[in-house]
Each structure stands twice: as C-alpha cells, then as structure tokens.
C-alpha cells in the first residue's frame, strides 16, 4: 500500500474538504521550517526515503551538472521557501518562481482546484509572489546548492504589455547571480494578455533586452504554451536561434477543456467557463507532441525541458524519447506523492541498457549510458 496515495491523498482531496492552496502553503511552510532549522535527522530520513542516486542518470547541460533529470516545475515553490529541502526529496533540480519585480497578491481566491477524476488541476493563480528582492534575499541565505536552481521570470499584472521587457529585465538584474538558469514565462494563461507575448514581434524585444544584459553568461530559456500551432512554434524557434536561447520549456498549462470527466467545480460552476490553465494527465499527450516537434525541427540541437502530465515511468520515457533533455513534475507529484521521483529514477536507470535490437527506444537523456553534454 502507498501511504500517501491510498490514505493521505484521499483525505487531502476530499475527506478534509481543504482548499488545495491552503494545503500547499502548509506543506511549504513545513518544508521552510525544515530548511531554516536544518533538522538533520528529518532531512536524513527524507534522503533515505526519496533520494535515488546513480551516476548514470547525471546530465551535464549548459555547463551545469544535474544529478538526475527530474526537476520540480515552476509554480510550486514560487518564493523559494523550501529551496534547500528539495534535494532531500530526490529532485535533480528545482525551478522557483514565477517571480515578478515587485510583490503581488495574484488573482482572487479560490484559484486552485484539484480534478481527481481527470488526475488534473485547474489553476488561476496569477503570479502571486513576494517579489524578486525577497527571492534574492532567500537565495543568498542558502547554505549549499547541491542541485541547479532555475528562476522563472514573469511580468507584473499592472505592467502594460508594451513595457513587459522592463519587468523581465528588472527581475533578472536582481537575481542573475543567484540563478543557474532563467526562464522567460510568456505562456501563463492567468495574467491578462501575457500569452500574446509569445508572438514573435512581442517576444523579440524581450529577448533582445535580456540577452543584451545577459551577454551569454546565464542560460536563458522560454516557456511556451501547449496551445500554440506549429507556425507559431516555428516563429519562436527562429527567435531561439537569433537570440541564442539555451532551450525551451515545453509546456505550460492548457486552456483546452475537451475530454475532461469533470464538469462542475463546487462554488465555481461549470469547468468549461472557469478561468485558468489545466495541468496534469490531460496535458501529457499534447506536451509530448510539442517536445517532439521542437526536437525534430531543430535536429536535436535545442535542449528541451519537458513538463506536463508525468505520473509514471512510461510518461517520463515518452518525453525523453520525444527529445527532452530534462523533465519537470508538479501535478503528478501532488497526486503520486514524494515516492514519484525515486520511482521514476529507478526506472530510468534500469532502462539505460535496452536490448541491442532496439537502441532507438532509449531515452534521449540517458542514451547508451552516456552523459549528455550540450554546452554552447
């Protein structure tokens, strides 16, 4: 029996009738306490339970060493409250944020909903965060950095779209010495107009501004939506080449509501009319399609962080085989619990030696047991 999946999750999702955001905040506060107190006995127990180390899983990318290819996606630990604890839960990297130049409360509550019938979540958070300065201060206090830390950058809600570049630049300047890689988030559906910044004519000045400041010192990526069509992705790939992006994160949440079993949300009404993005299992297939398209269109030359609907080893393998170099989990981790990461890693390590007759089935990130090296 899986204690989390069979006992704790049903209580959290239904038995306690708890607001999902309240539960998440409570977990983050507990992990923040662990980080602050460095309760070594508890941290050691977490490491024994959830860390799986195997040098065959190491990924070297952008001059960074990732102990394994499974990371925590942006949005869970926006303010880096537990950034020192995620390594003890087995993650190979963590992406904090989305962060904006100044603090902002986000959209009105309730704004996070679990959809258990669909193994999914609906969120309409709106970049709630304490601001770049607060995150910078927290990252400066880190005692050690055993895994790479990515920082996801966003535009403030009150900032006009035509001034978006200034917002991304302001946060980058505050945080550039503290992040190992940076992600430009122009794909969240929860800030009015933000997704329009994925259009080439809108995205180009943002990338020009950031890369002009960056001068190639930090890996810069863009996170894209799953709802883009192929010509729109092609335009972003042209910008990726023109502005020497280090990679893409594929994908953010989706606005699509088709094929969902959930129809109504208590206190909110019809799901079809609810604002926000869907994450989890319904996103798996489309995010993998986008990963495969990018990988093929760039002949495997543009690294991809694959995210969306990873619940099982098969899900993870699918994205690696499609062309992802690294993976991120969020909703799957909420549903499956902390045992998900070591379970995935054990499976990936076992999969590194396939039958000689089927080398094409090897995950891209661990082909033939070799470590990936993709430094520009």
Curated annotation (Swiss-Prot):
Cofactor note: Binds 1 FMN per subunit.
Superkingdom assignment: Bacteria
Catalytic activity: (S)-dihydroorotate + a quinone = orotate + a quinol
Cofactor(s) of this protein: FMN
InterPro entries xref list: Aldolase_TIM, DHO_dehydrogenase, Dihydroorotate_DH_2, Dihydroorotate_DH_cat, Dihydroorotate_DH_CS
Keywords linked to the UniProt accession: Cell membrane, Flavoprotein, FMN, Membrane, Oxidoreductase, Pyrimidine biosynthesis
GO CC list: cytoplasm; plasma membrane
Endpoints of the signal sequence: none
Residue numbers binding substrate: 78, 123-127, 185, 190, 252-253
Pathway membership, UniProt: Pyrimidine metabolism; UMP biosynthesis via de novo pathway; orotate from (S)-dihydroorotate (quinone route): step 1/1
Enzyme type, top EC level: oxidoreductase
MF-aspect GO terms: dihydroorotate dehydrogenase (quinone) activity
Predominant localisation class: membrane
Binding positions for FMN per the UniProt entry: 74-78, 98, 152, 185, 223, 251, 280, 309, 330-331
HAMAP family: DHO_dh_type2
Protein's UniProt name: Dihydroorotate dehydrogenase (quinone)
Gene label: pyrD
